[in-house]
Amino acid sequence: MDAGKLRRGDRLAPIADSCRRLHAGRRFLHDFDMFEIQPRYLAIVLERGFRLPARYEEFEPQIRELERAMRVHPEPTVPCNNDLLAENFIDVGGEMRLIDYEYSGNNEPSFELGNVWSESNLSPEQLEELVAHYYGSPLRNKVARARLWGLMSKYGWTLWGSIQDGISDLDFDFWGWAMEKYERAVEELDGPEFRRLLSDVQRED
């Protein structure tokens, strides 16, 4: 699978099904929480003197506000892949299979949906459809939760890219990869919908 095919929209129901199958399985040994991972990555970047995007730390108060809003009605954690770029879905006769469990751990289901949305640049309407396939209807608080997890994912993985840019010998533009994530995160943090999403995620639908 690739992001272009995923954006066509006809694979959203099978993707939701594949996530539900994984989430119904046995729990992993470890948890995965981007609100805990991102500060650790930031500490490494600052300690080692790696490159940090302009204004990155300026958004930290908003990120902590985001975390507080998300903690109001946390979802029960389930076994998650946590790295749902399109290439980690394999279409087997119309059924989507998941591969690459390097970052697997127990996490909220909505993180997975937000990760799918973010990694493949789906539209907000496609995220609503994905949420509806997973939960049975496009609940406002779940849509907001998935979108905010997608935002937090981009903000956190930016630092992973910065670290790799500083230490990796691979012939890959990790900084460019990180900046693509970061610029999209900034667009959302500076955007007009951020406050509404913080409100929606605290609803009880």
Model-identified regions with their sequence ranges:
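Charged catalytic carboxylate motif
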Residues: 14, 18, 58, 62, ...
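ATP-binding pocket architecture of kinase catalytic cores
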Residues: 1-36, 43-57
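ATP/Mg2+ or Mg2+-diphosphate-binding catalytic cores
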Residues: 50-54, 159-205
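Active-site activation/catalytic loop segments of kinase-like enzymes and analogous catalytic loops
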Residues: 109-140, 151-169, 184
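Active-site acidic catalytic loop and adjacent metal/ATP-binding pocket
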Residues: 67-113
